Design a protein with these regions (language model features):
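Donor nucleotide-activated moiety binding/catalytic core segment of transferases
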Residues: 308-313, 333, 337-392, 396-400
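Catalytic binding pocket for nucleotide-activated donors in carbohydrate/polymer assembly enzymes
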Residues: 368-460, 473-477, 485-489, 498
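N-terminal pre-catalytic "stem/leader" segment of glycosyltransferase-like enzymes
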Residues: 2-8, 43-213, 217-218, 463-471, ...
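A Trp-anchored, charged/polar loop motif used as the substrate-binding/catalytic surface
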Residues: 126-144, 195-199, 287-311, 362-365, ...
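Short, solvent-exposed loop/turn segments at secondary-structure junctions
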Residues: 91-93, 158-162, 219-222, 241-242, ...
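Conserved donor-binding/catalytic core segment of Leloir-type glycosyltransferases
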Residues: 314-328
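Catalytic core of nucleotide-activated saccharide and alditol-phosphate transferases
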Residues: 180-314
Length: 523
């Protein structure tokens, strides 16, 4: 995204930053002679490496660094595993799709705004992990340019984040022709991507795809993933576990259980996706091959009042908090009806006035979003059209998540002890939500809050250079406020303000640590 091409109104931004880019034209940025790849960081064989351009470009220097894989190796081995090869995927399946963005925040974690050309973190488009994870891997010390030594292969597709052009905006024939739900074209695009990988590289066939990683940020995660990917590792936001699943989105064009046939695909597309769970921490038939539910991206300003960025820990004077879509204008199956039921109970019972039980949209619950989260004891985690990032919101604010989604793993539930810092309520027990929460002893509440303070940093992304610098600035500012307020308060509120390095053991590091544990199982 460091390269922005301006037309009459909006920028066309790339999903990644360029390290050796010579010019930008109406056809897009071009790499310097001798360089290639998605980020122009790869040098053609036999040519000497050139000095990085990053130090000469302040707008780059503040946001990223040269990929270690693009630098002359040191005399002693210092590299850390896992080593990950990032495919320079055919542009049709990734970067070409981004030209169809009609709004700057779509499908990116960062954009450059005109006329000041400032970098703005973007989490309003909730699928931003697609480009974020891609960029993190490109500049990571875990990246390798040598596929022969790779532990894993990352496939940076854009099927999940920007399905509109895949379904009907892009060049004809739209992956087996137009028609049917958008999921059909997305499925066909990923099957074509595997065909392209097989025609271009030998690595998929070498281990049957077990060491290949695919990210699914779509509302219903990998529920619709084509069966050809079953042996691969899936990173997803939606940890639905039930094997006999059906689409529950209220967004009709994304229903993955509605088949469609045409002359280009007379068998329909359901035959290519049936039979696998949406997510499985232990995949049947593929021993050791696992999936992982990972966090959605949240910009630092989203949680600016949280003790996680060293803001003062304050009294938790809000018993329960949720602000967002409560299904007032949705189909009944939205959120499995959970948000609607809790909202109705609270409104009819006058819980806001009686118990400081706050739930509703912006008209019902007003005030600073981060401030309210940082003052709440319990926070609702319920689905939307599929996954919802409310678990991340709760955890990074030190609020105890109240999870009401049956048979669904939340973020990192397969690798962290979520029970130690969260509360689970069965969907059948929604009517008892107030009774259940009121019955939790104060000692248990403080224990869960303390445990949140041990893991909350793993639910935010902080290691990208620009993110790290912004987080440190925010922490410095909040620490000064904390020093001023400390003299006026002797109470100890949990979790205590975070004092560590925001780049250490963040969400990306947690994913890499988990991948390291999976290396033996891909062989």
């Amino acid at each position: 995204m460091a390269a922005a091409i301006w037309g009459s109104a909006s920028p066309l931004e790339l999903d990644i930053d360029m390290f050796h880019i010579s010019s930008s034209t109406s056809a897009g940025p071009r790499c310097d002679d001798g360089y290639y790849g998605h980020d122009c960081a790869r040098r053609k064989a036999g040519l000497p490496l050139q000095p990085s351009l990053i130090p000469t470009r302040p707008w780059l220097a503040s946001m990223l660094h040269e990929p270690p894989a693009a630098i002359e190796p040191p005399p002693k081995a210092t590299r850390k595993r896992p080593l990950i090869y990032v495919y320079d995927l055919e542009p049709l399946y990734q970067s070409k799709l981004l030209q169809y963005r009609v709004s700057p925040p779509w499908c990116v974690h960062r954009r450059h705004d005109w006329p000041a050309n400032i970098s703005v973190w973007s989490d309003g488009w909730v699928y931003a992990a697609d480009t974020l994870l891609h960029e993190l891997l490109l500049i990571s010390e875990h990246r390798t340019f040598d596929p022969e030594e790779a532990d894993f292969f990352y496939v940076p597709h854009s099927a999940s984040c920007l399905p509109f052009p895949i379904g009907n905006w892009a060049d004809y024939p739209w992956f087996k022709g137009p028609g049917g739900p958008r999921i059909r074209q997305m499925v066909n695009m990923l099957m074509e991507a595997v065909d392209w990988i097989n025609a271009t590289y030998p690595f998929w066939q070498r281990r049957g795809g077990r060491d290949h990683i695919w990210l699914f940020t779509h509302d219903e995660g990998a529920c619709w993933a084509p069966n050809v990917l079953n042996s691969s590792i899936w990173l997803t936001h939606w940890g639905r576990l039930d094997p006999d699943h059906k689409s529950n989105t209220a967004y009709i064009v994304d229903r993955y259980d509605s088949d469609f046939q045409n002359h280009l695909q007379p068998e329909g597309f359901l035959t290519h996706i049936k039979g696998h769970p949406c997510y499985n921490p232990e995949k049947a038939g593929f021993p050791g091959s696992r999936d992982l539910v990972i966090p959605a991206f949240k910009r630092p300003g989203h949680y600016g009042r949280s003790p996680l960025v060293a803001a003062p820990s304050r009294e938790r004077d809000v018993f329960f908090f949720f602000r967002g879509d409560v299904g007032k204008h949705r189909m009944p199956n939205y959120s499995r009806g959970v948000r609607q039921k809790v909202y109705k109970l609270a409104k009819e019972g006058g819980w806001a006035e009686k118990y400081k039980f706050l739930i509703g949209d912006g008209q019902d619950v007003q005030g600073d979003y981060s401030d309210l989260y940082s003052r709440a004891v319990f926070c609702l985690v319920a689905g939307g059209d599929g996954w919802s990032a409310r678990l991340e919101d709760a955890v990074i604010h030190g609020c105890i998540p109240v999870i009401i989604i049956d048979d669904v793993h939340v973020v990192f539930e397969s690798i962290l002890d979520v029970e130690s810092f969260a509360v689970r309520i069965a969907e059948a027990d929604i009517d008892r939500i107030l009774e259940i929460l009121k019955a939790i002893p104060e000692r248990t509440i403080r224990s869960k809050q303390a445990h949140l303070g041990k893991v909350w940093h793993r639910y935010r992304y902080g290691s990208l250079p620009g993110l790290a610098s912004e987080l440190r600035q925010l922490m410095d500012s909040n620490e000064r406020e904390q020093e001023r307020s400390a003299a006026n308060s002797t109470a100890v509120h949990l979790p205590r303000p975070f004092k560590g390095d925001p780049t250490v053991d963040d969400a990306f590091a947690t994913i890499l640590q988990w991948l390291h544990s999976r290396i033996p199982h891909t062989r």
